[in-house]
Amino acid sequence: LSCGDVATQLAPCINYLRSAGPLPVACCNGVKNLKNSAATTQDRRTACKCLINASKSISGVNFGLAAGLPGKCGVNIPYKISPSTNCDQVN
């Protein structure tokens, strides 16, 4: 799993995360694909770091929406998408 994979899966979510539109089906599909491809602890930590870095680098991201995204898509991930998340603690 690479940050490129994470970015590709979550690209359809960007406008939603900027509070600029409805939650697209393609975004939730990307969230689900990402969860399914993060099979190991190392993959989950990588995905976490990529998500946090991406969310910090995209201007105008609403972190409340980012944190709620997995739940809105019906996906459980073992960490919060937040700038303060310590990805090294993700199992």
From Swiss-Prot:
It holds the Pfam family Tryp_alpha_amyl. It is found in: Secreted. One of its GO terms (biological process) is lipid transport. Keywords: Disulfide bond, Lipid-binding, Secreted, Transport. CDD domains: nsLTP1. Belongs to the plant LTP family. This is Non-specific lipid-transfer protein P5. It comes from Vitis sp. (Grape).
